[in-house]
């Protein structure tokens, strides 16, 4: 779900940024680049999510990352490689901006769409911090947060084990559990 939302928002945002005739293009580009370098901070972002009623909902994870500025810059750069003659021919045939975008530009841009989908899927798959901050409900926690808790909880305190052989055996089992958990959770990325 996140990949579809993010790629859709990214593609729709990148299109006007790629057009030379878009008024305010430099202003919006400056705002987007500014947000790449300077975030709002953890506490203000949490307070905003809380006031919007998004804490303990899936939307607290999906909405803040819906527009990835770096991916928008990639899509914008790819849009600029599409010949302007396609747009001119479509406009001469009576095509609107929306028709040109969905019927001509999107089919031509399938490679960048595939790249953006891959980037967003891997980014969401690897993120657990937002879920750790915004989701208290155990039923809403993603697999990454569950894996993190398994890996953190299986730490062995050597002061509690008196027999060194037992300590080594327990450490091997804990490591085996960690590694098998990581391998099993990586299957969707490989497939």
Model regions: which residues?
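A hydrophobic, multi-pass inner-membrane permease signature
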Residues: 1-191
